[in-house]
Structure formats: structure tokens, C-alpha cells
Amino acid sequence: MARELLFLACAIVIADSWPAKAIDIESLFGHTIRIEGEYPERTLKVDDRELHRNALLLFDGLFIVDGVPALIGSSSNGGNACDGTPFVVSFPPGARPRFDGPIEACAYIGHEVSDERILFSTNNIPGQGREQWAWTPADGMKELGVAAFVPDDKSGWQALRERSFEHPSDALKNADIAATIKSLLGADFEAFQAIITGTGSGEFKSDDYIGRTCTPHMCREQEALLFLSAKDRRAYAAWKPHQKKIIVHPPVKQWPEKAKQELRAWAETWK
């Protein structure tokens, strides 16, 4: 049965608060684990045997998977371009500790632990899906490929009342709102989706939501606007393709006045 050993995970976090000294976790299932050295040359050792080296090494939690203790950690080169990626140190009974990973990816990677495996996944991104890897005591870390994107927010238009969107692309993770946007845009949906999942932010004005994004490294050249009206549960979308005119759905005359104001302000960039 998978379960997290919280007391040990807490001890790991406390130990790791001493950056200039060797980090000692004594007698973990009969083994000694250390993170030695200072940034940017830190080393993970088990029983004085070096398993991995990188600028930043952290432990995230200890679990029992299929009867085997598994310590999840993350490794980073210290830059801000990519998040740290996971590795697993396991302690099979009657065998030497094993090291798997770190996963080769430049993205935030979360994990879900079940009785038989640890599932690692990137974020569920509209139009891209999520990359997944599975770790088991028998096979170590294995790439599962990309799982197709599926809207997993079932809150519908109540999401506007809940103020649950952190990025405009969250609208596409909401099954009901995504269906509304797809119906509105038709064949243009993928072009809009590619921009609305880019760099940007959103805000709530009254109960309405306004999101603005741009394609990374192409801001002011390729941007998108999304207006979600809580009152009539309708979506209004506009985007500016690179070196082309602004595309608007539905026609501007069908936009409510509040949405028109946002559209005019957003479009000022290209006047």
C-alpha cells in the first residue's frame, strides 16, 4: 500500500536548510544518505557512493510503492530556464539502493503515487496534452509518451464566480467553456488556441473574465484576447496573427459594450 512517511519527509526538509554543510539522513532503511557540497556542485551519496551531482538537489517525499521505499527528489542546474526534474532513490529489501532519473524535460513535473507505481506528469496544456513517465520498483523510470489533452475542469461557468482562472488558457481546461469557444471559432479554434496558451494573464471585472496573451518572443506581433461574459455565458475572442489583420469572433456588432471597450483598448497596440 502506497503511503507517505511524513515524519521523514519533514526531517529531510529541515536537514536541507543547511546549504553549506553535508546533509545527513541517518540510518534510512539501513543506509546513510547525504547531500554534500555547496552550490553549484552538490552531490547525492548513499552509503558514501556517489549517485548524482548537480547544482540544486532537493527531496520531495518518501513513499512505499509495491512494498519498496521510494524517495522522490528533484535535480536542477540552478538556472531559471527550467524547473528541477524528478529522480527516485529506492531501497529494495536485500539489494543495494537504486537511482532512477532525473527525467529529461524542461517543464514543471508533478507526481501521483499509487500502490504499484509513481506517475510523473507535466501540466495538462491545451493543444499539447501532458508528458508522462511511470516509476516502478521492478522497471525503474519509463517514458509513457504524451497523453492527449482533455478538459478536466467540470465546474462550467461557475468557474467565473469561483475566480478559479489563473491564466487565460484555463478557460480551455474547463469542459463547458472550452466547448463554447470551440463552437464559436470553428475551424479557427486551433489558431486561437496556439496563442491563448502563450505568455499572458487575465483579470476578473465584476463577474466577467478578460484574458490577454501573446506568443512567446512575439508579443505585440501575435496576441489574443478572450472575454467571457458571466451574464449570458458567452465567449468573445479576438487575435492578431503575425503580419495579418485582427480576427474577431463573433462580429464586433454582436459584442456587448463592456467587451467592445476591452477590444478597443487591446487593439490600440496596432493603430
UniProtKB/Swiss-Prot annotation:
Residues 1-22 form the signal peptide. Keywords: Plasmid, Signal. It comes from the Bacteria. This is Uncharacterized protein y4bG. It comes from Sinorhizobium fredii (strain NBRC 101917 / NGR234).
